[in-house]
Amino acid sequence: MRTYKHMTVNDAIPKLDSIETQHTDLESGDPMADILLTYLNGRDIARLKMTDAEIIAAVEQALVAQGNGQTVIEPRVHLMPDPAFNGHFNVLRGYVAPLGLAGVKVVGDFVDNYKLGLPSEMAMLNLFDPRTGMPVAVIDATFITDARTGALTAIGAKHLARRDSKVLGHIGARGTSYWNVRLLDSLYDFDEIRVHSRRPESRNAFAARLERDLGKKIVVTEDWESCVRGADIVVEASRLERPAPMLKTEWIKPGAFVVPYGTMSAVELSLTDIMTRMVVDDWGQCKGGMFGSLRAHVEAGKLSEQTLYGELGEIAAGRKPGRQSDDETNLFWHRGLSLSDIALGHALLEKAAECGLGQKLVYA
């Protein structure tokens, strides 16, 4: 039996009262009662109206579990059906012992979907009872993917950015970008928010949505430098077709907090040279794979086990300190954690049960 710090797997798994399954002896030949799972579609999730605080709390719970050695993460895998489709699938897998759930998420990332009026990232999350392998839930994970990504960015800032940060520069207007800005602003109440993306119609629509929901003016910039230079917090969530050093290291002011997580690298190799602390969500995922904003830095040895300060879960769990002074210039690179998907999926299931939302489907 795998043993976790201070607990065994059986100790760690809470009783899953919400799983409506009835097991019988399959070898006896007696009829087996229906095995049910919960299905939450996008409309159900929208009706739940998860608050910013609920989203951040759910994701931080998974980070703390990770930092305490109570999780299992399998490195993500990719499927590229055809280069002509300009997209790929990511498959994320994990287990969160304190929640008693294992999960597998499949998310499609198709850059040209905007031409069809579709989101670029659409996902499904499957949750399972880790003791039996039985399915617990199937959830539309498009919201989960967007919101948990923003929560990771915000939690990274909570531990690694200056507390008096007042200017945010955000590159990119994809689905996750909205939640980056919204959840960061929920923690910092910025005086100035700047946004930029490649397509004018995209960045203008992004700014309009933020102004409506945050109730403050958003500055739309015409170029990367105007967005980034002098900002206290910089988030790079671009969608480049191939690596290109669009974000210049000289634009980053001392004491800033930088979050690069675009699929393709958009930063200079010298970016890591100015950093006090470099933190990732999961080193196992970051050190390999086809994609990632700091892939070239890993391959060049600029980001390694020796130069890495730690994983965000270690900081969230109190095992390592976060920012220690205003002079630090810190970086957080996240590839996306299956643990965050599972934790937010769990929070949605709990709230859906309280609100009477979702459908019970017969699995077997």
What is each PLM-predicted segment?
Residues L187-L210:
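NAD(P)-binding Rossmann-fold cofactor-contacting core
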Residues D44-K49, L269-A364:
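Adenosine-phosphate binding glycine-rich loop
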Residues T8-D146, A154, D164, G310, ...:
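N-terminal ligand-binding/catalytic initiation module
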Residues I19, G215-K302:
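Rossmann-like adenosine-cofactor binding region
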Residues D164-K166, D191, T329:
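Nucleotide donor/acceptor-binding cores
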Residues T153, D164-D185, S197-S202:
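Glycine-rich adenosine-cofactor-binding loop
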